[in-house]
Amino acid sequence: MIQKETNLVVADNSGAKKVRCIHVFGGTGRRYASLGDQVIVSVKAAVPGGVVKKKEVCKAVVVRCAKELRRKDGSYIRFDENAVVLLNAQGEPRGTRIFGPVARELRDRKYMKIVSLAPEVL
């Protein structure tokens, strides 16, 4: 479960390393985001010379979430960290590589580019 003020790891090579959630998309009263949900983040730590700079505000999609998620078949998926991939205005990833596994739920949410770049889909 991702909410406002949650610190997140960036799972792509856009230049950002750590970000903080400042808004969850999906209505006025929406409090939590889970796998495949979009959030607005503020960059807290970035690599020098990267595409993304510190203090920049951008959209992101949650690709790994520490809170377990129940699937239709009764199984649960859970990760060790909360991670996002930064998106551009068209909803495509800003980086050209994805680090670490991503959840299968992204395929259902039509993030095919992220799924194809990921080294492993769980």
Curated annotation (Swiss-Prot):
Binds to 23S rRNA. Forms part of two intersubunit bridges in the 70S ribosome. This is Large ribosomal subunit protein uL14. GO terms for cellular component: cytosolic large ribosomal subunit. Part of the 50S ribosomal subunit. Forms a cluster with proteins L3 and L19. In the 70S ribosome, L14 and L19 interact and together make contacts with the 16S rRNA in bridges B5 and B8. Belongs to the universal ribosomal protein uL14 family. GO terms for biological process: translation. InterPro entries: Ribosomal_uL14, Ribosomal_uL14_bac-type, Ribosomal_uL14_CS, Ribosomal_uL14_sf. GO terms for molecular function: large ribosomal subunit rRNA binding; structural constituent of ribosome. Keywords: Ribonucleoprotein, Ribosomal protein, RNA-binding, rRNA-binding. The lineage of its organism: Bacteria, Pseudomonadati, Chlorobiota, Chlorobiia, Chlorobiales. HAMAP family: Ribosomal_uL14. It holds the Pfam family Ribosomal_L14. NCBIfam families: rplN_bact.
